[in-house]
């Protein structure tokens, strides 16, 4: 992503690998670079930055977070829903995480639109690396060699 231009759209990610994967996917799919990626350094910092960002609607019009499920995708989801509920800015009643990620519109149009993706696929425990593995064809020669070395 072009981090020299400041856009009103922000994506919070855990680490540099997340930034590189998102940037590569955008480039590969020829998506417009109209958002900035902020590397937060850890899942805790992503959550902290998310809490701060949704309290100030003037800063970002759209806020995305991409965070690893690690061992508990449901727990991670509930953590994020709790933040949204406590903000009072979103209708969280019966809110579920769709397999293709969440886009949540605010109750007041002055507040930010929220996007959530829980790695690897909004459904399973795991992380960025598991997501990337899903992108590789099982017929890939290098992947087969890597699997053989396990």
Question: Predicted segment positions?
Answer:
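Acidic, glycine-rich catalytic loops of TOPRIM or P-loop NTPase phosphate-binding modules used
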Residues: 1-71
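Activity-critical C-terminal alpha-helical subdomain
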Residues: 75-150
């Amino acid at each position: 992503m072009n981090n020299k231009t400041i856009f009103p759209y922000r994506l919070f990610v855990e680490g540099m690998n997340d930034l590189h994967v998102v940037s590569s996917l955008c480039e590969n799919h020829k998506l417009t670079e109209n958002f900035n990626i902020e590397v937060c350094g850890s899942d805790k910092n992503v959550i902290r930055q998310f809490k701060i960002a949704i309290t100030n609607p003037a800063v970002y019009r759209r806020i995305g977070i991409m965070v690893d499920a690690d061992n508990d995708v449901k727990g991670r989801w509930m953590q994020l829903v709790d933040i949204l509920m406590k903000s009072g800015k979103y209708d969280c009643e019966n809110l579920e995480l769709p397999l293709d990620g969440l886009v949540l519109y605010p109750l007041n149009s002055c507040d930010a639109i929220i996007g959530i993706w829980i790695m690897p696929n909004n459904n399973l425990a795991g992380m960025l690396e598991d997501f990337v593995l899903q992108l590789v064809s099982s017929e890939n020669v290098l992947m087969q060699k890597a699997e053989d070395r396990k």
